[in-house]
Amino acid sequence: MGSTEQATSRVRGAARTSAQLFEAACSVIPGGVNSPVRAFTAVGGTPRFITEAHGCWLIDADGNRYVDLVCSWGPMILGHAHPAVVEAVAKAAARGLSFGAPTPAETQLAGEIIGRVAPVERIRLVNSGTEATMSAVRLARGFTGRAKIVKFSGCYHGHVDALLADAGSGVATLGLCDDPQRPASPRSQSSRGLPSSPGVTGAAAADTIVLPYNDIDAVQQTFARFGEQIAAVITEASPGNMGVVPPGPGFNAALRAITAEHGALLILDEVMTGFRVSRSGWYGIDPVPADLFAFGKVMSGGMPAAAFGGRAEVMQRLAPLGPVYQAGTLSGNPVAVAAGLATLRAADDAVYTALDANADRLAGLLSEALTDAVVPHQISRAGNMLSVFFGETPVTDFASARASQTWRYPAFFHAMLDAGVYPPCSAFEAWFVSAALDDAAFGRIANALPAAARAAAQERPA
């Protein structure tokens, strides 16, 4: 029995109730989950069914407690069930769950975002990051009168058809980019968008140009050929959906210059980085003035809410002021808005200092344990987000991320889970810390890591 199977079998007894719940879920929900990565497909074993969470601790249906290093895939910077957020949500819910009409809090949340990200002059609230990027792309096309969109291999912008081409996140985790019928696109050459999922038609992705990430030469060549047809370039401000792979120095600024030269828009997707890596998101680290931004996760406080915004000149093309249609029955939901406002207002300088310090501490523990076990690795960072890539080669794009030794990750993951630490269940997902991590949590992480590192060291490629 290999170390992955051993790790999985050790936790199976401790996850008996979760296993029963998963079996029941599979009878009514495709794959037993409502978002594919949660199924543990990449690592094997039984998904943990979480019943409650407080601070930095998750509690599953079997009563097991885990240090949370996923944070609901990013939003929970304050930790779970933060008193200020819970109180705000309870008060909002007591006044009514949804009105289908404007509310004062919507304007307050929009103002909070505008006050943090200088290029954003107008905001439209939506319900998910997918809606935010989908709407931003539609608006860019409507504003410019052009059709083509440039995106980057490994960047994930939700599951909107036009952007689900060579995407990261769950698409990478499930290997949907690995279809042998898909032609490879050589570095520094543009490729026509090829759908990453059945059900996405070739026509839907035909106006999507996919380029290798961090390759500004490929961008310049593409604009030289298609510049008058390109409506926008969309990129994660700092990608976290092929693992954490930050932009090279000046990459986003170069995108800004090239798009401006050709009359195209730049869309920075800050759904993941926004208000997590700094008070102003990635813009606070690398202040590139994009035309449009997409936000989600932290600004929702963990509720279903997101937003897109940007220059007033562009945003005023949206209905009801302009002809570009976008709408949503539950957009600006008062309970979700209350959670977002409470989170942003509670996230003071001390919170961001704690997030950075906790990420530093976690990265140090990871590297120390893996070095001691003689496991080749890279700890890739973007502010307080990080990823562990196994291998000697630095990861700078999707190709190098996929070339890393991902076969080591399942054993590493299960050894951590077995010891009461909950890391991301895919090598292509980011690790997230909260400000609620304390010495007890770090003690558990430190105790778990040596065995996890040894498990990774013992793995061999299939």
Swiss-Prot record:
Pathway: Porphyrin-containing compound metabolism; protoporphyrin-IX biosynthesis; 5-aminolevulinate from L-glutamyl-tRNA(Glu): step 2/2. Its main location: cytoplasm. It is an enzyme of class 5 (isomerase). GO terms for cellular component: cytoplasm; plasma membrane. SUPFAM superfamilies: PLP-dependent transferases. It comes from the Bacteria. Its EC number is 5.4.3.8. GO terms for biological process: protoporphyrinogen IX biosynthetic process. HAMAP family: HemL_aminotrans_3. Belongs to the class-III pyridoxal-phosphate-dependent aminotransferase family. HemL subfamily. The lineage of its organism: Bacteria, Bacillati, Actinomycetota, Actinomycetes, Mycobacteriales. InterPro entries: 4pyrrol_synth_GluAld_NH2Trfase, Aminotrans_3, Aminotrans_3_PPA_site, PyrdxlP-dep_Trfase, PyrdxlP-dep_Trfase_major, PyrdxlP-dep_Trfase_small. This is Glutamate-1-semialdehyde 2,1-aminomutase. Residues 178-200 are annotated as: Disordered. Its cofactor is pyridoxal 5'-phosphate. It comes from Mycobacterium tuberculosis (strain ATCC 25618 / H37Rv).
